[in-house]
Each structure stands twice: as structure tokens, then as C-alpha cells.
UniProtKB/Swiss-Prot annotation:
Function summary: Might take part in the signal recognition particle (SRP) pathway. This is inferred from the conservation of its genetic proximity to ftsY/ffh. May be a regulatory protein.
Pfam families named in the record: UPF0122
HAMAP family found in the cross-reference section: UPF0122
SUPFAM superfamilies cross-referenced by the UniProt entry: Sigma3 and sigma4 domains of RNA polymerase sigma factors
Family of the protein in this entry: Belongs to the UPF0122 family.
Name of the protein in its database record: UPF0122 protein UUR10_0158
InterPro entries, alphabetized: RNA_pol_sigma_r3/r4-like, UPF0122, WH-like_DNA-bd_sf
Organism: Ureaplasma urealyticum serovar 10 (strain ATCC 33699 / Western)
Length: 99
């Protein structure tokens, strides 16, 4: 079982990198992380083994972490958002976010 922070981190990475995953990987990720289905429930629904679901989702998580390690899109967005909080001018913050 993932802790809550890691779960949200993986969901954030998925939002960024889902276009790099296969249709099946996206489907399993959505069922588990967004629909909150267990591996057993997904396996029954998709008529595959529980271990196939587990293997696929472990691979997806590894890929998402690998993509972030290489591209750092999440990390850069987080740093950028942290800097926005230091700016007192809300008009300027809005303009910067629109870029």
C-alpha cells in the first residue's frame, strides 16, 4: 500500500506523462488510482491475472519516476509555483502563469 503522498505524487506524474504510456497502462492506472479498484477487481474486470495487473502497474510507476528523473517537469513546475508564492503582486503572478 502506498502512502498518501506517494500516491498523489504518482497521480501528478501521470497527469504530466500519461501520453508516454500505452492505452492498457493508462486504463489500469485509471482504474486503480482514480476509480480506486483493487488489483483483484481490475483483474476480474479485465479477465487477466492479479499478477498481470500488479506487474503492469509497477512498470507504470517505474516509468513515471524514470520520466520525471530525466525530464524534471514536475519538479520545475513545483519550484515555479513555490516562487509564485513569494511574489506579492497578484497581477504579475497571473501574467507569469499565463506564459
Amino acid at each position: 500500500m502506498l502512502n498518501k503522498n506517494k500516491r498523489w505524487y504518482l497521480i501528478a506524474l501521470y497527469d504530466i506523462y500519461q501520453g508516454l504510456l500505452t492505452t492498457k497502462q493508462c486504463e489500469y492506472f485509471n482504474l486503480h488510482y482514480f476509480k480506486d479498484l483493487s488489483f483483484s477487481e481490475i483483474a476480474e474486470l479485465k479477465e487477466v491475472s492479479k499478477s498481470a495487473i500488479s506487474d503492469c502497474l509497477n512498470k507504470v510507476c517505474d516509468q513515471l519516476l524514470k520520466y520525471e528523473q530525466a525530464l524534471l517537469i514536475y519538479e520545475k513546475n513545483k519550484k515555479r509555483n513555490d516562487l509564485y508564492t513569494l511574489i506579492n503582486d497578484s497581477e504579475l503572478v497571473k501574467k507569469l502563469k499565463d506564459i
